[in-house]
Every structure is written in structure tokens, then in C-alpha cells.
Amino acid sequence: AINPGQVYGKLDGIETRDPAFGLEAVWIAPEQREHAQTLGYTVVDTATVVATHISQLLSNNAAKLLGYEEVQQLMDMLAKNSPKLVDGFVPDVMPLGSVVKVMQNLLNEGVSVRDLRTIVQTLLEYGTKSNDTEVLTAAVRIALKRMIVQEISGPELEIPVITLAPELEQMLHKSMQATGGEGPNIEPGLAERMQQSLLDAAQKQEMVGQPAILLTSGMLRSTLSRFVKYTIPNLRVISYQEIPDEKQIRIVSAVGQ
């Protein structure tokens, strides 16, 4: 019995955590199922828990499973339907290693690479302008923005987001510029406070059944994503440029105020 964030009573059983998403849960006897559902718990059987956990493990480690051979196979499959798109792409526009790195970057942040046509089209456009895989990944993410936002927040037109206070974001921008784009030099005490504030904001979102999304500038997005990846894994970090035109944002909290 998984606590989705708001339940109306406690259950007798063995307290645990859902292995896939880390939510509070209780192992209960089969005859308690109906009672648990009445209290607001999401009840799943053992097989579903195991299957979901395995699926989550595969998703979390997808980037490690994708290498040169797998990407070449994907290119070969795309070439069957779109030969002109793939012809001359590798290695004329960019080496296979760069394509692999961009796709690994996407998978590392839970972005599907199934829309291979859009990924290749974007790399064809930007690959002649830059060989920086971080820049190329950002360009691909913008091209995939509708899919990214759809997978995070669903079909709702309004997206609830967490932001950084303007003063904090500006300070991080200046720090990033001072390091030549290597990443902001954050004082340890500030980093700890940011982590805690972002964790609190993310947990509040999860408690009301909404996705935890941090909205920030394109310059800071990848750095902040790495900053929270292991401490707040359910917090998705997107940039202003990744919000589709038809979507509206609703700021639920501003960290640093």
C-alpha cells in the first residue's frame, strides 16, 4: 500500500518505501486491500512492485546501456526509412562519439530518445556550428520540449514550477561567467541551504500529487540538474526555452527568497 502523499489513516503492516520512487509504503495482508484503498492508499501486488522497480532501474541506467554499437544500430534503422537524413550525418557532420554522448546526456535526465528523427535533424542543424556536446544536448532538448514537458506534467496547460529567486539566479549567472561556463562556484553553506530548500519545495509538490519541476535559465539548467540528480532525484530541471508556447507556468515557490 503506497502513500501517494495524502491518506486518511494508518495501516497495520510492515512499514517500508516504494523501491521505485521512494514513497512511504506499507506491506499489508491481502484482506486489507479494500480498507487501504478507502484510506487513499495506492495498492499494488508484489509482482507489480517488482516489475516497476526493474523498469525504474533500467530507466535510471539506460545511459550506461547505450554505447557505440547500440547508437549505430539506431542510425541503421533510421536510415531504412529516412536514408537522405542519415546519409552523410556520421562522420561528415559529427563523429559517432558525439552522437552517443548527446543521447547519453538525454537518457541521464530521463529524456526518451525514441524520437530519433528529431534528434538527428537537430544535430544536423547545430552540428556544423558547435562540437560541444552540452550545447548540442541543450539544442536537442529544446527541439523535444513538447515531449519532455508532456512526460513530466501530462496534458495540463498550466505547469506548476519551482524557481530560484531572481537575486540568487543572477548571482549564479555571474559566478558561472567568472568560471568561463565551467559551473558556478557555490560557497558550501549556500549549496547546502539550496539543496535543503529545493528538497522541501519538491516534497511539497509530491505531497499534493504534482510533479516537482525546477524552472531556470538555459545557462544554469544542466549544472543545476547535476546538482540535484542524486539528492533530489524526482526534481526535474527544465529551462525557460523548453516551455512550449501553448503552456502557462504557475510559480509555486521561489528558492532563495
Labelled PLM ranges:
Residues A1-Q257:
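Membrane-embedded alpha-helical signal segments
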